Design a protein with these regions (language model features):
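Short N-terminal edge-element motif at the start of the domain
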Residues: 1-25
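Calycin-type beta-barrel ligand-binding domains and close structural analogs
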Residues: 20-162
Length: 162
């Protein structure tokens, strides 16, 4: 969801399994940025002490309490984005530097997404940084999500996204 009190383009992302929806395994702030060459990237920010903001997708007061000081840019985790006929697709920058600690083990993230007017698909997989072997994530392919709500009316005009 948009975080209009932060820098333009700031979006709150919570990822949780349906059976533990109140305890997200990932909460981030994503911030798209147009580059001088016309390309688009999405900067990926961790949130310090993230449990404070769990449920922020549905709780306006929690969203409002997120401040720039709470954010830490995740080095190596920027998404490189391309426009497609259906919308956009992106993947984490190359180099195996987007490090993620999962179940007490370090891994590097390989992540891709496709975004359209009707939904999105995403796949996240972790790999061992020493062996490059798969250690976590989807085995059966991308997760597919249908769009059920729009928060476009929460995007402030001053963001000038068009």
């Amino acid at each position: 969801r948009p975080l209009p009190h932060l820098k333009p383009g700031s979006l709150l992302l919570e990822q949780a399994y349906a059976i533990t929806s109140k305890e997200p395994y990932r909460i981030r702030v994503l911030r798209p940025e147009g580059r001088a060459d016309g390309s688009l990237i999405i900067n990926n920010y961790a949130i310090r002490d993230p449990q404070r903001f769990w449920g922020g997708i549905e709780d306006q007061s929690k969203r409002d309490s997120i401040q720039e000081e709470d954010l830490a840019l995740l080095e190596g985790c920027t998404y490189l984005v391309s426009e497609t006929e259906q919308g956009f697709c992106g993947e984490v920058e190359p180099g195996c530097k987007c490090m993620v600690k999962r179940q007490g083990m370090n891994s590097y993230l390989v992540s891709q997404f496709e975004l359209s007017q009707t939904g999105m698909s995403t796949i996240d997989r972790g790999h061992n940084p020493e062996t490059n072997k798969y250690v976590w994530g989807s085995i059966a392919g991308a997760f597919k999500f249908d769009k059920t709500e729009s928060y476009a009316d929460e995007i402030p005009e001053q963001w000038n996204l068009r």
